[in-house]
C-alpha cells in the first residue's frame, strides 16, 4: 500500500477572517503564507499549514488554473492541537495570560505529556501539547 507522509493541512472555519488571522499570527506567532478574501494560510513548524477559511466561502467548487477544489465547510467548535517543547509550557501560559486568553483546561497525560486548552475568537478549542501525549509524540 502507498503510504501517507503527514497531515499537511488542517482547516478551521471562521466567521471573521481578519480577527482570526490576527489571533493566530499575533497570539500564537504563526507565519502567514497566503491571503485572499476566502482564506488565510499559516506555516506551522515548517512542515504543516493551518488554513483559516471564511465560513461558507468554500461551499461551491473552487476553480483554479490547475484544476478544481471540491466544496467543503465546517460548523461548530472544532479542535486543533499544536506541539510545543516541554520547557516552553510556562512561557506559553504567561503569553496567553498577557494576551488575555483564558486557559480552559489542563491535562497531564499518562505518557508524561502536558496539554493546555483555550479558545480562539471563533470558539474553536486550541490545544498546546508537549511530547508524551501519544506513542508517536
Task: Label the model's feature ranges.
Residues 3, 93-137:
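Vicinal oxygen chelate
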Residues 13-59:
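Core segments of cupin and vicinal oxygen chelate
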Residues 16-17, 85-89:
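Helix N-cap motif at beta-to-alpha junctions
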Residues 23, 88-95:
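Short amphipathic alpha-helices within nucleic acid-binding modules
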Residues 55, 60-78, 83:
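Helix-adjacent hinge/juxtasegments
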Amino acid at each position: 500500500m502507498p503510504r501517507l507522509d503527514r497531515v499537511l493541512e488542517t482547516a478551521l472555519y471562521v466567521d471573521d477572517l481578519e480577527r482570526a488571522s490576527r489571533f493566530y499570527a499575533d497570539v500564537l506567532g504563526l507565519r502567514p503564507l497566503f491571503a485572499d478574501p476566502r482564506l488565510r494560510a499559516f506555516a506551522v513548524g515548517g512542515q504543516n499549514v493551518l488554513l483559516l477559511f471564511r465560513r461558507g466561502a468554500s461551499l461551491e467548487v473552487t476553480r483554479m488554473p490547475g484544476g478544481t477544489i471540491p466544496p467543503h465547510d465546517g460548523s461548530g467548535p472544532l479542535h486543533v492541537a499544536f506541539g510545543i517543547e516541554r520547557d516552553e509550557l510556562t512561557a506559553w501560559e504567561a503569553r496567553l495570560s498577557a494576551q488575555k486568553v483564558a486557559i480552559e483546561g489542563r491535562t497531564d497525560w499518562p505518557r508524561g505529556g502536558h496539554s493546555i486548552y483555550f479558545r480562539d475568537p471563533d470558539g474553536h478549542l486550541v490545544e498546546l501539547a508537549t511530547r508524551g501525549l501519544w506513542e508517536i509524540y
